[in-house]
Amino acid sequence: MKKTLATLFLLTCLGSSSAYADNALILQTDFSLKDGAVSAMKGVAFGVDHNLKIFDLTHEIPPYNIWEGAYRLYQTASYWPQGSVFVSVVDPGVGTDRKSVVLKTKSGQYFVSPDNGTLTLVAQTLGIDSVREIDEKANRLKGSEKSYTFHGRDVYAYTGARLASGAITFEQVGPELPAKVVELSYQKAKATKGEVKGNIPILDIQYGNVWSNISDELLNQAEIKLNDTLCVTISEGSQQKYAGKMPYVASFGDVPEGQPMVYLNSLLNVSVALNMDNFAQKHQVASGADWNIDVKKCAK
């Protein structure tokens, strides 16, 4: 009897821990908050389960910018627990024959999205466990069948909420697909002695800092160390946009105000900034799959 009660207690504890993670629904869109689109999505999710925990990742993705949507998922996903469900709606192809999918990562999170490149970076960094196509006959908001332009509300928020609340299992999302997604092409980060190259996936928008996909591990492989003077080149495609020298430092206050610097951002990736100024604005630098950066030790 005591053993049975102990087992039930343990299962209850495990169940409530799992339920908390499974009930996390995280929304990302390019809708902004200027109108009622995001509220409609939340209303649909709340209608599925009044106890659902709904969070916002961001709704300020620039319109149609699939690449930035991909990066924001990568930036945040690893900090959310197993069982969390992300709904990402950056969908310029809404209403076309592009697939609507749910990707389960090897770390146990779920991503509900059009298969249009949005899942590129989470697939590459967290790994793909499996992918399922959303069966819209089973997983679509009732009464929305005539709507072709708001799948974020009618399909993605609805399916994400059903999955997060436990109303459906992952297997009930729809048929399993090959374990791959549409991937955007970009410059993969790489290192050689004294030099690293990579992509500029995003800007630290508030401050104008330039973030790369070059990890601190690659910097170590290149034998680049704190206080080295580095030559930095930034290009858009084949067109050079910036070239200059700057120190590699730990933080902003290590250089005078207005001076350039290389540092590691909060994701431990190589970044470029001006202390208390806007590097991207001053040098007309942007981000995306076509924006690349080269950082190397300057010749003495």
Label each PLM-derived region with a short phrase.
Residues 4-14:
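Sec-dependent N-terminal signal peptides
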Residues 17-21:
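Sec/Tat signal peptide C-region and signal peptidase I cleavage site
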Residues 24, 36, 48-54, 65-71, ...:
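Active-site histidine-anchored catalytic micro-motif
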